[in-house]
Amino acid sequence: MSAGTSDPAPTGESRFKEAVRRFDEANAGGPNVELVEGCFQSKELVYARHMTGRLDQFKPNAPEPLRLAARCQHIQRWMIPRIRFDKGRDGYREWRTTLASFHAETAGGILRDVGYADDTVERVQGLLRKERLKADSDVQTLEDVICLVFLEHYLSDFAAQHNEAKLIDILRKTWRKMSERGRSVALTLDLEPNLRSLVERAVG
């Protein structure tokens, strides 16, 4: 290869792995960390790994855009903190909408850099923006995985921060987002007894 000529873009599985590496690299610098197996790691990076792990269990052989979207669902989330928006429901919704657009644009830039075609980039971005939830099976699968990861890995922290009435409200809203299959899987999660009781009361 002559001097000044850039390396060709990766293709196939190597392109997917490079995209994941770039997503993880972007997430690794987050200021919010948690202790995982004796090492402090960015919360966004830990979350990304939870998402991939749960998707692999929930839908083995998921299409590539869905696998990509799961990995970058919260990419660099710390860049747009909740505190920038008004308190209350309207401020929360504005924050979530702004985050979805930010995640889609950030992921799109990485995907184009590693050689993905526009149709794949746009598909991943649509998944991240949750376009056509309930009508698009892949969007619904992503939402199911998000909810399952929340229940399995983050509900305990929420339980420590909110009263019981608030928790039940959160759980009911989470349940409404899920498909019947997602709900069935949720009921099999290995939750602490107090959390399982809360879930059963919320959805019973």
Where are these regions (language model features)?
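His-Asp-centered metal-binding catalytic motifs of divalent-metal-dependent phosphohydrolases/nucleases
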Residues: E64-R82, K87, H103, A107, ...
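A ubiquitous short alpha-helical element
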Residues: L35-C39, D90-R96, D136-S137
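Flexible, glycine- and charge-enriched loops at secondary-structure boundaries
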Residues: Q41-E44, R93, T97-A100, E164
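Helix-adjacent hinge/juxtasegments
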Residues: I83-G126
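Divalent metal-dependent phosphate-bond-processing catalytic cores, especially two-metal-ion Mg2+/Mn2+ enzymes
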Residues: G4-R21, E25, G38-S42, R49, ...
